[in-house]
Amino acid sequence: MWRFCFFLSLLFFDVSAVKSAESIFLPSQIGVEDSRVFESLSLSPVCSAADPNLNYKPVIGILTHPGEGRWDARLHSLKNYAYATNISYIAASYVKLAETGGARVIPLIYNEPEEILFQKLELVNGVIFTGGWAKTGLYYDVVEKIFNKVMEKNDAGEHFPVYAMCLGFEILSMIISQNRDILERFNSVNYASSLQFFKNVNIEATVFQRFPPELLKKLSADCLVMQNHYFGISPDNFQGNPYLSSFFNIVTTSADKDSKTFVSTIRSKRYPVTAFQWHPEKNAFEWGSSEIPHSEDAIQVTQHAANYLVSEARKSMNRPSSEKVLSNLIYNYKPTYSGYKGSGDDEVYIFT
């Protein structure tokens, strides 16, 4: 008897499975009425035409920084060494950030002859000023010259974005404020923080515009961004400087380890210029510090920041010859793995 019952249960299972399988149809197996449902879902997609107002092969120029990327107790001797040897570098995480958004990179070697440097600037659709320590000397002067040239391009009608991070934020603040002493000391080295959106801020046209609402909430409640700087600007001092307050809107602030508030994200009111005191590139691409956030939410912050950078660069109509671009791309250089040495960056491009 039990065998008979077992047989019936198997038979019932097989019939149910067959019916279930038969309920799954390919488009060619359904009737005319049902086929209309599939037609409404566009099973025969039409590829959209390219937008003539967008550049689908954007190139980002990244300015090199003096030195080899090492960051330790010998900082002052490293500064002297860097300037004496003419060595410069780019942390590979900045390159990967641009590539994540769909762009290629051309290194802008800061101590090359100015004529060559500005020839390369004509090959790119946007510029990144990276983190580092060089706030004086040739490096500062080169950042200022490039920034002024970029502003001329924008004033002439060319959309040319700037992305400035950490040191880049600080130097732009010094340049625009016309005050090299504008920076203040903060206890904000090597730690993760939240971002607090500034009062009455409108995030439209900012890096945060396309962030999902849930991620925007988490930015203010969780430690999703990496801070690594000794200097910054308080909101009061920022707003108290007429040049800064007329050029930039404060988008976010953050607090250091002593709960002192500093400006952490700014966006130009008129130009495609965004500056971060924090490091959007580190979450996904740097592993040397245990403080760097690597959660899925933190990685999304990096991805959205990269997408924004490149979406701005796509608006640039600068389209130089392919041959000139290819011969200057960073693919012509080899990165050096330096993470095992305890460097501040896992991977760097070194230029000698």
Swiss-Prot record:
Highest taxon of the lineage: Eukaryota
Pfam families the UniProt entry points to: Peptidase_C26
EC number(s) on file: 3.4.19.9
Endpoints of the signal sequence: 1-19
List of catalytic residues: 166, 279
Taxonomic lineage of the native organism: Eukaryota, Viridiplantae, Streptophyta, Embryophyta, Tracheophyta
General function of this protein: Cleaves the polyglutamate sidechains of folate polyglutamates in the vacuole. Is important for polyglutamyl tail length determination before vacuolar exit. Plays a role on folate stability and intracellular folate content.
Top EC group: hydrolase
Protein name in UniProt: Probable gamma-glutamyl hydrolase 3
Source organism of this protein record: Arabidopsis thaliana (Mouse-ear cress)
